[in-house]
Design a protein with these regions (language model features):
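Membrane-proximal intracellular helices of multi-pass ion channels
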Residues: 1-290
Length: 290
């Protein structure tokens, strides 16, 4: 699965960083691994991403006792689960939502890189799938040596946007996503019933979006807006200097999104201004949604 012999410790490190969706690498993933190696890494990222996100959903319950009424109510609230015994259904929902969002992301990524990568359609499709998984699972590993500032994709600003959105959705976590899916289902069902005459007006169901969801979404929006603004300000005449306005905005947005959980690079870290490095450190400390 490698193009040349690499030390066992490096292979172990890459496997660990993939399944733990950390994104740190000791070798160039693009040149050190074959296509089979990249597939293995993608599978490890997917397993780790689903595992970590599922684990974090249940982590708060792990020390509280299986039969505790408080635990059951917390589980019901966290996962938006009406029946506390329906954990298998929750796991299936997690798998479905993961594959659905990654599939949509892979489609848009492919449409943006189509005709621009060596290796033809097959390589472009794999690039799209790999990066959709890597972004949604917040791994930050790329099959290009230059990551997101590789010459092949550096000017693909739509690609930067889709990568950022996948990172954001993956970082929010499944309890948040399920909350909004339940709200969407409620709104659609109300609309359909009004259209077919089964009810005359919108029926409000309170507390579909819980307090935890409100806090996470609002804090995420604040961090995205302020992070992008500060990144743009600090790097405007530095790494963003030669880019068009659209490129500056796209790179600043991804540059503010990726430090919190993912690890994709929109520029060589050694070339960033000291204030940008401090901003990156702060965003890394804050991280994603709890």
């Amino acid at each position: 699965a490698t193009t040349h012999r690499i030390p066992f410790i490096d292979a172990l490190f890459i496997s660990t960083t993939s399944v733990c969706v950390t994104g740190l690498t000791t070798v160039d993933v693009a040149t050190s691994f074959t296509h089979i190696g990249h597939i293995i890494i993608m599978i490890l990222i997917q397993i780790g991403g689903i595992g970590v996100m599922t684990f974090t959903s249940f982590f708060a319950l792990s020390f509280m006792g299986k039969s505790s009424f408080t635990s059951k109510m917390m589980l019901k609230d966290m996962l938006n689960e009406d029946r506390t015994g329906g954990l298998f259904r929750v796991i299936l929902n997690i798998l479905f939502v993961t594959l659905f969002i990654e599939g949509i992301g892979a489609y848009f990524i492919y449409m943006d890189v189509r005709g621009s990568l060596p290796g033809g359609t097959q390589q472009e499709l794999f690039y799209a799938m790999f990066h959709a998984v890597s972004a949604f699972c917040n791994a930050g590993i790329s099959t290009l040596s230059g990551n997101m500032y590789d010459p092949l994709v550096a000017d693909k600003y739509n690609l930067h946007f889709w990568i950022a959105m996948l990172i954001i959705f993956g970082g929010l976590g499944f309890p948040i996503v399920f909350n909004y899916l339940k709200l969407l289902h409620h709104l659609l069902m109300n609309g359909i019933k009004i259209l077919i005459g089964k009810q005359k007006h919108y029926i409000h169901t309170p507390r579909i979006i819980n307090v935890h969801t409100y806090i996470v979404v609002i804090s995420t929006l604040i961090l995205l807006i302020t992070g992008t603004a500060f990144y743009l300000f600090f790097e405007y005449d530095n790494t963003l200097g030669d880019l068009p306005l659209r490129g500056k905005l796209a790179n600043a947005f991804l540059g503010a999104v990726t430090p919190r959980t993912a690890g994709f690079n929109v520029a060589d870290m050694a070339t960033l201004a000291p204030p940008t490095l401090m901003l990156t450190l702060i965003l890394m400390v804050i991280g994603a949604a709890p």
